[in-house]
């Protein structure tokens, strides 16, 4: 609908017609009309309440109920319309609005089965909900705004053939960053809590910036510890082949030479290598004097801070836009003392965990604290915990054995009889190996795997074997469990397959140290076992692996802490709920 439509005329010639004006700042030039009580006859006769026509096409459908009646009835009515009579021109409907006067929500017209979970309240920029129909109409339905929503903020999921409309906080974030890009050369960042759809927001920003002639290149940077394969899959869901993942620094440079590649997704580390290596200087020099935008995913990561100065030298006109669910403040500053604001300057929009829980976009947490050391030690006292926080105590055979027994005892109840699954994060590779071997002794029917990165040279962390050998053992067990043929030489493929198995609940428990604790989304993951000390952003990021919305069978994310104490949890929640 947004592109030119070819129409064959009576004389056989072809004319191209623009059905909808999508040009910047020309949205208001579309023609708007309102019609009431349109009757459509399909399998049954249905009468639609209010239809907004734009250039003669029914693009917005509004269904109303009387005050006091649950407005979900209007949603159910839309479902009936789609089944029985919403055809012909009404297939062009982009947005549905439902209201009982007091509560009002909007949602996209999807070919997929509709779910009330994906209906949204509109808000102001400060996340204050606009419930009342009159106020909603004043804010959401002005000609320019509704046209902009349809032309800019609808996204087609090419994989699932699903039409999506962006949520208000996503809209405001992109609008603010676009304004920042077009009107200034200054940096900025967005603080949207984990699980709130930052990938979609950053994709839309990348897409819109890439169409601007003033922007020579958009780089989307992720950390190699995160699931860059997951990110690229999501990007290409939203627009097929919009972005290619760079496999090496040479591939990155080749893409930078290709002027048709306006969006390049790569890792922070590959970009850092490109900037360091003199042999790539001639390609990087091509961007001198040109406006380049770097969009940094999970920008609280210290790695970007370390390479920021180098990139700044190589790309003097670059702007940096960061996305994070857990910014760095003075309390959790990076090792060099810098905060997120020190690098990215201005916070242009926030949507906090308390907002997301209130809106039903993510779940809350149910946290258990399990004493595993000594009843004479006050687990709430940080100083005493530090005093006993030694490898010898924490790696004690009996302690590990007791925790494994406890996990096996509670796992079925925590995961709703294995409808869901769990990640078990521990403090070190030696501890992970010890847990893996302890689980294996039990001959449990739980499907358990382990994953970690190994170093080429190690300082005798393990007395009996190099960690790579231990990982090789785990992969061998995994191969037998799932009839695969991975090894440490094909670690990337193993990593990808483990990711899929967790998402599909084919694994019951995945043992990790740091992997999978940031950027990994799996709706069927509902439990996190924690035998390490977490705080601040690391705590919120790890806990948030469990809080993706699924069904009523998943009311919250389960957290079972064997070291992290209540004060650390309370402090982290307070810090990121300001």
Which residue stretches match the model-derived regions?
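Conserved C-terminal RecA-like helicase domain
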Residues: 391-512
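A short beta-strand element within the Helicase C-terminal
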Residues: 512, 516-541, 557-561
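Conserved segment of the helicase C-terminal RecA-like domain
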Residues: 545-576
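Conserved RecA-like ASCE ATPase "motif II neighborhood" in helicase/translocase motors
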Residues: 263-296, 301-310, 493-499, 512-514
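Conserved helicase ATPase motor motifs in RecA-like P-loop NTPase domains
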Residues: 193-194, 298-301, 314-333, 360
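Short, conserved "post-DEAD/DEAH" coupling segment immediately C-terminal to helicase motif II
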Residues: 80-84, 301-319, 546
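Interdomain helical connector at the RecA1-RecA2 junction of SF1/SF2 helicase-like NTPases
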Residues: 332-421, 436-445
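ATP-dependent helicase/translocase motor core
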Residues: 1-217, 226-242, 259-262, 269, ...
């Amino acid at each position: 609908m947004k592109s030119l439509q070819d129409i064959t005329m009576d004389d056989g010639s072809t004319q191209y017609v623009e059905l909808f004006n999508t040009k910047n700042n020309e949205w208001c030039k579309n023609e708007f009309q309102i019609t009431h009580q349109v009757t459509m006859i399909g399998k049954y006769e249905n009468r639609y309440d209010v239809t907004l026509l734009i250039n003669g096409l029914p693009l917005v459908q509004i269904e109303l109920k009387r005050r006091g009646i649950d407005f979900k009835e209007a949603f159910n009515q839309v479902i009936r319309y789609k089944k029985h009579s919403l055809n012909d021109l009404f297939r062009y409907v982009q947005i549905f609005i439902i209201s009982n006067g007091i509560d009002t929500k909007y949602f996209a017209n999807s070919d997929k089965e509709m779910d009330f979970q994906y209906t949204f309240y509109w808000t102001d920029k400060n996340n204050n909900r606009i419930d009342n129909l009159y106020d909603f109409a004043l804010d959401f339905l002005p000609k320019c705004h509704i046209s902009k929503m349809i032309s800019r903020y609808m996204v087609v999921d090419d994989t699932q053939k699903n039409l999506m409309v962006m949520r208000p906080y996503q809209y405001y974030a992109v609008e603010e960053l676009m304004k920042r890009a077009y009107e200034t050369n200054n940096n900025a960042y967005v603080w949207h809590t984990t699980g709130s759809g930052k990938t979609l927001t950053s994709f839309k920003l990348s897409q819109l910036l890439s169409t601007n002639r003033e922007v020579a290149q958009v780089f989307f940077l992720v950390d190699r510890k995160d699931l860059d394969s997951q990110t690229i899959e999501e990007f290409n869901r939203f627009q097929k082949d919009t972005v290619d993942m760079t496999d090496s620094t040479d591939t990155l440079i080749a893409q930078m030479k290709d002027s048709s590649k306006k969006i390049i997704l790569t890792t922070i580390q590959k970009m850092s290598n490109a900037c360091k290596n003199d042999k790539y200087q001639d390609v990087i020099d091509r961007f001198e004097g040109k406006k380049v935008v770097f969009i940094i995913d999970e920008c609280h990561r210290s790695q970007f801070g370390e390479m920021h100065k180098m990139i700044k030298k190589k790309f003097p006109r670059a702007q940096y836009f960061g996305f994070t669910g857990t910014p760095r403040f003075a309390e959790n500053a990076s090792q060099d003392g810098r905060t997120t604001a020190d690098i990215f300057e201005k916070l242009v929009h926030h949507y906090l965990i308390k907002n997301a829980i209130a809106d039903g976009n993510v779940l809350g947490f149910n946290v258990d604290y399990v004493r595993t050391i000594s009843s004479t030690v006050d687990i709430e006292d940080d100083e005493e915990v530090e005093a006993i926080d030694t490898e010898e105590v924490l790696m004690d055979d009996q302690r590990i054995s007791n925790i494994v027994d406890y996990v096996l005892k509670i796992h079925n109840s925590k995961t709703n009889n294995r409808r869901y699954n769990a990640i078990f994060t521990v403090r070190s590779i030696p501890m992970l190996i010890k847990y893996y071997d302890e689980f294996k002794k039990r001959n449990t029917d739980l499907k358990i795997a382990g994953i970690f990165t190994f170093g080429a040279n190690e300082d005798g962390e393990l007395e009996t074997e190099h960690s790579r050998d231990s990982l090789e053992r785990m992969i061998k067990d995994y191969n037998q469990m799932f009839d695969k043929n991975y090894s440490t030489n094909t670690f990337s493929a193993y990593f990808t397959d483990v990711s899929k198995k967790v998402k599909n609940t084919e694994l019951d428990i995945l043992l990790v140290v740091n992997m999978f604790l940031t950027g990994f989304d799996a709706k069927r993951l509902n439990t996190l076992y924690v035998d390490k000390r977490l705080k601040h952003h690391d705590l919120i990021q790890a806990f948030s692996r469990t809080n993706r919305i699924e069904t009523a069978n998943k009311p919250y994310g389960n957290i079972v802490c064997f070291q992290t104490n209540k004060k650390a949890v309370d402090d982290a929640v307070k810090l990121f709920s300001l």
